[in-house]
Amino acid sequence: MDPPLPSLHSPQWASLLQLHHGLMWLRRFAVLVRVYALVVFHIAISTAFCGMIWLGIPDSHNICQHESSPLLLVFAPSLLWCLVLIQGERHPDDVVLTMGYVGLLSVTTVFYTWCSDLPAILIDYTLVLTLWIACTGAVMVGDSFRAKRWELICSRVLTSVFFITLWVIGDQTVFHHQRILLYGYGAIVFLMMTVTFYGTRYIRDELPAAQTLRGSLLIYVGLVTMFKITLIVLSPNLWRLPWTTVFAAFRSSYCEGGGGS
């Protein structure tokens, strides 16, 4: 005759439940470690590549005064980010594809930053990483076995501080178009912070262990998107660039070729 099962309120069940929760936490923690190690690796590659090119070719920093087309590269990470989000788990978890994303965004970021200056780039880099760490930290304060109370508190505090800061800066802005640009930036960044917040929760609780590359891409591409959008706000010289110079070099060479024929 089989021995009777222990009662649901018995110490044996409590120990088994605690062990089960501990094993689940270890599995999720291993996934998180892999995802965020990949994110740090992607950021390190992009930072090293962009730093070497940006500092190694100083003559190219004024390229946007004659050719404004690098500004269009602000849309590159946004399109890739939407692609990764829309495809979801159907997106290939492939090393070659992931490194292709990192390489493409690193190259476009170099051309894009040539339209700005070093102080704005460094401030932007620090600000975006701080926002990302704050969003990620707000999610990681609570785990999947506890109430989401701390997540709610941290997210509301972070949102309040962000919008109060934005309102103070906007109130001191003289020109109307600058205020519109600043508030538009705030709306976009708030949307991206919200996606980052819930995306981090998804990675923490639900991301399959076989999809760590896709999880790291979600975070990395979102960071590059925030970096490029923020750089526009921190670089007033970009607001005054004439859009008539977009593809100016291509149009001039085309006209010369057409004139010669």
Curated annotation (Swiss-Prot):
TM segment ranges: 37-57, 68-88, 95-115, 121-141, 150-170, 180-200, 215-235
Major subcellular site: host cell
GO cellular component, one term: host cell membrane
Alphabetical keyword list: Host membrane, Membrane, Transmembrane, Transmembrane helix
Bilayer topology annotation: Multi-pass membrane protein
Source organism superkingdom: Viruses
Subcellular location: Host membrane
UniProt KW Transmembrane keyword: yes
Keyword Hydrolase on entry: no
Membership in a protein family: Belongs to the cytomegalovirus US12 family.
Name by which UniProt lists this protein: Membrane protein US13
